[in-house]
C-alpha cells in the first residue's frame, strides 16, 4: 500500500456509501495529500432480504465481509453504522474511532398519519427491528406489525405502494440521505428507546496498524465515544446483537452520563427497563451494572426465549 493511500471497506447501500464518503471527506480535510479510495462490497445481510433479520440469526450480518477485507489487507479501515457493529471483534481488529453522533431517535414515517397515536386500530406498521416492535406493541397493541426489509429507498417505496400505513426508520439515516421531509414525527426515547450506538458512525481497523490509527485519531468524537461505550458495555453483558429486542441510550447531561436501557418480549407483553446516572469515567461499569439489573429483573428469561434457550449467564 502506498503511504498516502487509505482504502475504506464499505457496504454498497446508499446510506453505507454516504457514511464512507463522510469519513473520506473528514480524513482528506484533516490530512491534505491523503488519497482515500472506497472498496465497496456486499454482506450477508444485504443478500438475505426475504427473511426477518431476527430469523436470519447470527451477529455481524452487515460487517463480516468488511472485516475479512481488513484481515486480508484488501482495505485499511471499515466504516460501519454503530448499531450494526457486534460486541466482539475478530482477533487483530478493533473499533478505534467513533464519529460525532447524528440524531439517534427513531422516525415515524407515514403518508396519511401525523403520529403513532393517530394511527387507527388495525393499521399496518413496518419495521425490521424487534426492539422497535416490542415498544410499538406495548404502546399500541391494536396495531399490526409486519417485517420490513431492504435499504431506506426500498422501505419507503413499500410504504408509498400502500403495503404499510406507516413505517419506523432511523432519523439519522433519513437526514443523511436528504429525506428529512419524510419524517412525520421523531419518536422520543420515552416512546422508542434507540438501538445501541444508533446515529453514530464507527471505524474499525487492524489494531497493529499504527499509521492508520494515527490518521483516524482526528475523527474521534469524545462525547459520542463515551456515550456509545456505556451503551455497548450494557449490550456486551447482555450478549446482544443488532437483531434482539434491546434498547440503550446514553446522554451526557451536566457532566454526568444518563444511561437508559430496556429488554422486551417481541410481542410487547413484557418490557424490563432500567437506568443509571454516573461519572463519564465509569461509563463501562455503568453499562455492565445496568445489564446485571435487567437480567435479574426478568431480562434473562426474555432473552433465553429470543436466543432459543441460550440465555446470558
From Swiss-Prot:
It catalyses: 4 porphobilinogen + H2O = hydroxymethylbilane + 4 NH4(+). GO terms for molecular function: hydroxymethylbilane synthase activity. InterPro entries: HemC, Porphobilin_deaminase_cofac_BS, Porphobilin_deaminase_N, Porphobilinogen_deaminase_C, Porphobilinogen_deaminase_C_sf. Binds 1 dipyrromethane group covalently. Its EC number is 2.5.1.61. Its cofactor is dipyrromethane. It is an enzyme of class 2 (transferase). The modification S-(dipyrrolylmethanemethyl)cysteine is found at residue 242. Pathway: Porphyrin-containing compound metabolism; protoporphyrin-IX biosynthesis; coproporphyrinogen-III from 5-aminolevulinate: step 2/4. One of its GO terms (cellular component) is cytoplasm. The keyword Membrane does not apply. Keywords: Porphyrin biosynthesis, Transferase. Coiled coil: none annotated. GO terms for biological process: protoporphyrinogen IX biosynthetic process. Belongs to the HMBS family. The porphobilinogen subunits are added to the dipyrromethane group. Tetrapolymerization of the monopyrrole PBG into the hydroxymethylbilane pre-uroporphyrinogen in several discrete steps. Monomer. This is Porphobilinogen deaminase. The gene is hemC.
